[in-house]
Amino acid sequence: MSDVDNWEPVSDNEDSTDSVKQLGPPFEHASNNDNAGDTEAESLQEVPLNTETNDVRKNLVVITNQSAADEHPTEIKHDQSRTSSTSSFFSGMISSFKSNVPSPVSRSTTPTSPVSQPSIISHRREPSMGSKRRSSRRISNATIAEIGSPLQQVEKPDEVKTRLTPSQMKEDNYDHRRFVEERYMDTPYHYASEQRNKDFHETFKSVPKDDRLLDDFNCGLNRELLYQGKLYITETHLCFNSNVLGWIAKVLIAFEDVTFMEKTSAAGLFPSAISIETKMGKTLFNGFISRDAAFGLMKEVWSRTLLQKDMASENINTKAEKSGNGKEIDDAINSIDEENNDKDANDNDTNENDDENISTNETTPNSTSSSPDKEKEKAYKLRADSSYQYDGPIYHHSTSFPAEPMANNEFVLKELPFDCAPGILFEIMFNSEQNEFLLDFLRGQEGSQITTIPNFTSIDGSSMTLKREYSYEKALHFPAGPKSTTCYVAEVIKRKDPDTYYEVISSIRTPNVPSGGSFSTKTRYLIRWNDEITCLLRVSFWVEWTGSSWIKGMVENGCKNGQLEAAQLMERILSKFIKNNVEECQITISKEEEEQDDKEVKNKLKEVDLEQPREAVVTAPAIAEQQGLKVTMETWLFLYLIVVVLLLFNLFYIRSIAVSLHQLVKLQLVELKL
């Protein structure tokens, strides 16, 4: 042990030790019992103390315990700028505590503990008010977090819990200028505004008014040319419209006709295209700015449309099964009633005369055997208040068309089943006296100035081939050129047989449009029995060229788009007319008559097959000499005009280059002179 450890303070007065033990803290020991401390205290009273000295005195902490010294290992910081009195005060204080006497508290609590190390004095700065506030906040927050709220821990009962839909979970941040608050079913997609919906229906007049617009996207249609326009998405249709420099392209695709859709790349490089596939082919839209948003909306509407279609078919099948079971039950009840009536009648006859009873018993099997031969079937007939007349069959076996129109390069627009006989549908569409359907159909295509619709007349003296002609004005939406064109229509009835099929070909010529004198649009209408009580309408078209044209592809695409739009309009108008003029009825069918009808139909179909085949329609037939010469001269004149324009541009550029060279030469001469 060193000398420092054995060192103890020595005082002239013996009571000083006891006083030290009683006071305990070194301040009291130094101020009351130590002579040196008294001297220093007197010197302190003589030195004037300022406020800074008082603050330092308050912040002085003396640590005599070893554990406390370990916890606060700070050094003594001296301010060199203090006054002489302040420095002497510190030196006196330090010298008074060099004795390193352990505190009485430590001696009393741990008598056997080793002697403590020398005391350490630290200068601790008092925390500011800001730090105190922050620490108080942390303490209060920690206390609150530990306590918690009992209301947050209580779970809601099962009756209160509700399942939120994705649309409710998603923030409602739609554009109020472009959309309304109403949503499409339970999806997060909003309907378009009233003005946007109105503008859409003005562009696509064949789309039903109740088919509301959801949204539109800027894109391009990939055909022979790239048509830049807008793709409109409604509840049931995909509609594309383009009108650039007079070239119009319109496409209408029903979602129920879509078989496949996918996101693809344009030209194999840019992932900004969407491919739509139907039974008629594939359509490619590219150049989408927001392809994912457009594809998501298409997929959502397509899935909802297919779901509604499946549910409707299931409901129809369920109703058919119920009606079939009810019919079987009614037939069984009626047969039982008839048998009971026959038995009662036979019993009465037995009581009257035995001979008559024998004859009745002999004839009864014949009468009972004939009852199952007749059956009641559902059919469709014209209403009593209908303006149309039809006296043909309303119940028949299904038939077929004689040839496939696709072999003649025709494009099938629609195949539509209707709840009526083929003859009823033919009378509604091509009746000579009642033309309400035809007038509504033409006006729906923006037709006006319709001439009087004449009756069909015979062409070659036979009643099988009939023809009629009329014309009307159709509005055009070209930015330049004529605002309307005259359409000359010629309708020819090729076949009119209520037992097999109907065939009508409509030819339309529009000479006022570009290359209008070189082509005509042919539309074929075929109607046959789809089953015993319904019919099937097939609409197809092709373009018949009588001359050549350098815009042939554009003309055919324009005709196709117009025909597709007209087919949509025709389907809607026909459904309305059939609903207003046709009703359901019950008829009695005999098996013998049915078998006889089958034989007659087979014979007629054989006769149709033995007939000469129809003329194959060639899309680009040979050009007549005079017409070909005229077309060739027009083409050469057009080419000559282009060459002349190019030569003029060339001369202009040559002259401008010569003027520029002349000016450069002048500038060089001026520089040489200078």
From Swiss-Prot:
Primary site of residence: endoplasmic reticulum
Residues on the Cytoplasmic side? Answer: 1-633
Family matches, as InterPro entries = Cholesterol_transport, GRAM, PH-like_dom_sf, VASt
Query: Could you list the residue ranges that cross the membrane?
Result: 634-654
User: What residue stretches are annotated with the VASt domain?
Assistant: 409-582
Residues in compartment: Lumenal: 655-674
Keyword Transmembrane helix among record annotations: yes
| Residues annotated with Phosphothreonine modification | T110, T143
The listed locations are: Endoplasmic reticulum membrane
Domain GRAM residues, every copy = 198-264
Q: What is this protein called?
A: Membrane-anchored lipid-binding protein LAM5
Which gene underlies this protein?
Answer: LAM5
